[in-house]
Curated annotation (Swiss-Prot):
Residues 19-306 form the RHD domain. The transcriptional activation domain 3/TA3 does not participate in the direct transcriptional activity of RELA but is involved in the control by RELA of the accessibility of target gene promoters. Mediates interaction with ZBTB7A. A motif (Nuclear localization signal) lies at residues 301-304. This is Transcription factor p65.
């Protein structure tokens, strides 16, 4: 009630007809923090009650009925009467011994004080501060010394303005002291400014019971309540002291609205209220909604989302005119579809069929006399060795082929095929080409093989096969086979060169030029000039046994 007395009963001047002091800008009661001396920083400036973030005001007084020289003293006194000198002190420009004193401008009647700060003292320095007030005669209301001992409210002070002017005779005239509204320290929860910082929701059912989380500045859990007010209605949120978390958060449930059968939303005010001094925070809007089955407010969220989507689409730069646009003109441009000839796929290196792929059943119609062939001749046709790809040149004794030969087959590396059983005709392309060619040949049993190979019997050119070392020749063949398996491509010229070197008995000559296709020779690597008595002397059974081994 003491805070309301200056508003209801304003202080009257001591002399109605004489000068008096009036406070036209009160100091701001809350929001300022009292600073300790040990903090080593300025205590700030006391703002005016109408001060904002953009417009700063300060405590201001007006001396009515007087213009001229004078002095003013501003000191701190207690909030409650008797107004004793307060142990806190004013600091700033023109401040000493805990109070402010300066001369007034004689040309003005309104005076503002911008550089006033409040510095608080510790409880252990309380007695020393009171003794200093008594020694400096800082006692505006002349409170006896015995009454100055006792408890002090260190979280609230008042400003006391004492103005001294000159009377017509030039003597000092002390005007009646004037007190300001209380100023509270913002550090103390019981006197700090109440402020709602944030809530998780600002609407609820008219039946109440909705849980709300509220964040605020420091409050005292035993001296705080959530206050709802509306037109002709007021209520309080329900919570316990345990629902106040660290003085900065409150979890409460909303009270039911006065009209439970609400049909339209109603807006009310929600505030923090301190019962001890009836201090209220700035109001925050809260909306009571009609009770429906939609407890989770799905329809409300859907409508809000729809409205947001509509507003976005209206502002969208891609939202063009609704008139149908003319069709886009299209120009026919001829295109040339060039059919690219596909490149031929790389073909693997081909080899003619070896003796292992010949179907010897085809030789049954042929009448060949029995004979023996030397072991050296049998070694000329190994089953696993590749054969030189060479075109056979028909001689005068050969009959032309009835049909062109098939393409040479691809040599597939692998183990030699067993010839213990009859070898069937191969179905692959190119297999059995040599056998088909031999099938269409007609031999005379009395015809000399040398005539077929070139009719050359010069001993200086050819050497008898009996002089060939079979073991050395077999070793060379084995080396050729291993080389053909280890390398990517078979060495086709390995066997003819080795045979020539062994037959002639000379060292390996330098690589000769490629042999022309017209050169006489056999596909198994024998030179066409080698002399056999007759092809009928060849024992094919011995040849087959040698191939199978």
């Amino acid at each position: 009630m003491d805070d309301l007395f200056p508003l209801i009963f304003p202080s009257e001047p001591a002399q109605a007809s004489g000068p008096y002091v009036e406070i036209i800008e009160q100091p701001k009661q809350r929001g300022m923090r009292f600073r300790y001396k040990c903090e080593g920083r300025s205590a700030g400036s006391i703002p005016g009650e109408r001060s904002t973030d953009t417009t700063k005001t300060h405590p201001t007084i007006k001396i009515n009925g007087y213009t001229g020289p004078g002095t003013v003293r501003i000191s701190l006194v207690t909030k409650d009467p008797p107004h004793r000198p307060h142990p806190h002190e004013l600091v700033g420009k023109d401040c000493r011994d805990g109070y402010y004193e300066a001369d007034l401008c004689p040309d003005r009647s309104i005076h503002s004080f911008q550089n006033l700060g409040i510095q608080c003292v510790k409880k252990r320095d309380l007695e020393q501060a009171i003794s200093q007030r008594i020694q400096t005669n800082n006692n505006p209301f002349h409170v006896p010394i015995e009454e100055q001992r006792g408890d002090y409210d260190l979280n609230a002070v008042r400003l006391c303005f004492q103005v001294t002017v000159r009377d017509p005779a030039g003597r000092p005239l002390l005007l009646t002291p004037v007190l300001s509204h209380p100023i509270f320290d913002n550090r103390a929860p019981n006197t700090a400014e109440l402020k709602i910082c944030r809530v998780n929701r600002n609407s609820g059912s008219c039946l109440g019971g909705d849980e709300i989380f509220l964040l605020c500045d420091k409050v005292q859990k035993e001296d705080i309540e959530v206050y709802f007010t509306g037109p002709g209605w007021e209520a309080r949120g329900s919570f316990s002291q345990a629902d106040v978390h660290r003085q900065v958060a409150i979890v409460f449930r909303t009270p039911p609205y006065a009209d439970p059968s609400l049909q339209a939303p109603v807006r009310v005010s929600m505030q923090l209220r301190r019962p001890s001094d009836r201090e209220l925070s700035e109001p925050m809007e809260f909306q009571y909604l009609p009770d429906t089955d939609d407890r989770h407010r799905i329809e409300e969220k859907r409508k809000r989302t729809y409205e947001t989507f509509k507003s976005i689409m209206k502002k969208s730069p891609f939202n063009g005119p609704t008139e149908p646009r003319p069709p886009t003109r299209r120009i026919a441009v001829p295109t040339r579809n060039s059919t690219s000839v596909p490149k031929p796929a790389p073909q693997p290196y081909t080899f003619p069929a070896s003796l292992s792929t010949i179907n010897f059943d085809e030789f049954s119609p042929m009448l060949l006399p029995s004979g023996q062939i030397s072991n050296q001749a049998l070694a000329l046709a190994p089953s696993s060795a590749p054969v030189l790809a060479q075109t056979m040149v028909p001689s005068s004794a050969m009959v032309p082929l009835a049909q062109p030969p098939a393409p040479a087959p691809v040599l597939t590396p692998g183990p030699p095929q067993s010839l213990s059983a009859p070898v069937p005709k191969s179905t692959q392309a190119g297999e059995g080409t040599l056998s088909e060619a031999l099938l269409h040949l007609q031999f005379d049993a009395d015809e000399d093989l040398g005539a077929l190979l070139g009719n050359s019997t010069d001993p200086g050119v050819f050497t008898d096969l009996a002089s060939v070392d079979n073991s050395e020749f077999q070793q060379l063949l084995n080396q050729g086979v291993s080389m053909s398996h280890s390398t990517a491509e078979p060495m086709l010229m390995e066997y003819p060169e080795a045979i020539t070197r062994l037959v002639t008995g000379s060292q390996r000559p330098p690589d000769p030029a490629p042999t022309p296709l017209g050169t006489s020779g056999l596909p198994n690597g024998l030179s066409g000039d080698e002399d056999f008595s007759s092809i009928a002397d060849m024992d094919f059974s011995a040849l087959l046994s040698q191939i199978s081994s």
